[in-house]
From Swiss-Prot:
This is Uncharacterized protein RP028. Pfam families: Methyltransf_31. It comes from the Bacteria.
Length: 250
């Protein structure tokens, strides 16, 4: 049995700042239109980004639509402070970032036309997962669109195999740096050991080990060595979401 107790703080190791085109409100609005909805106009849209990190995913939209208003929330005070400095330096006036637990999100923050929750759902407890769906139910405006991503089963089982190997190999080490270095050694061992093997399983392990070796250290720490990373079957997520009055855009 693997002891999954790696608590790697996002304050200690900030997540790398990425932008994700599939969470961009114009893209989400287009999807809604294709499904026969009448999503709110982008020019004056109110955006909520749950687990925003340093908030870079909000900046392009805010610059393009200066009359819009965006709020990004994240538990990591370090990431929020980094993001606030970026926003201040760029002189962007219509984005707010706040260090806040998802559990503390409520109606006092207002309602939103587009809510994005990318890279959060699989990495939090069941309590927080339920709260995310509650937030969408209470804070999403009529005809608004929400985006949630998560690691989907059964496909995630393949990556989780390597994740568990990395966690087992590194669990006796105390610091994030040591865990990461040991995991890199494991990946090299996997790659070297399977160099001449041509079985489908060996091919997968070898190629996945090579791929993980190219990722940023901070990404590997949170994705493969973090305390929680739980895959979800699509039907399980749909069953939970259907308990709320959502129309699912599949």
């Amino acid at each position: 049995m693997i002891k999954k107790t790696n608590k790697i703080s996002y304050d200690e190791v900030p997540y790398p700042p990425f932008t994700f085109s599939h969470t961009y409100p114009p893209y989400l609005r287009t999807i809604g239109k294709l499904f026969g909805l009448n999503p709110p106009p982008l020019e004056t849209a109110k955006i909520l980004d749950i687990g925003c990190g340093v908030g870079v995913n909000l900046l392009n939209f805010a610059e393009t639509y200066p009359k819009s208003q965006s709020l990004g929330v994240d538990l990591s005070k370090t990431q929020i402070e980094i993001g606030k400095k970026t926003i201040s330096d760029a002189k962007i006036k219509n984005v707010r970032l706040k260090a806040l637990s998802i559990l503390d999100l409520d109606e006092s923050y207002g309602k939103f036309d587009y809510i994005v929750c990318h890279g959060v759902y699989s990495w939090v407890s069941k309590e927080v997962q339920d709260k995310i769906l509650e937030v969408l139910n209470k804070l999403l405006n009529p005809n608004g669109i929400a985006f949630i991503s998560y690691n989907t089963l059964p496909g995630w089982n393949m990556q989780n195999t390597i994740r568990e190997m990395m966690m087992f190999h590194s669990e006796s080490f105390n610091t994030s740096h040591d865990k990461l270095q040991q995991s890199k050694l494991l990946l090299k061992f996997i790659n070297d050991s399977l160099e001449n093997s041509t079985t489908p399983y060996a091919n997968f392990l070898r190629e996945e080990a090579k791929l993980i070796s190219t990722y940023a250290d901070s990404y590997v720490l949170h994705e493969y060595l973090g305390e929680i990373n739980t895959g979800t079957y699509f039907h399980q997520f749909i069953e939970k979401a259907q308990k709320k009055p959502f129309k699912l855009l599949r």
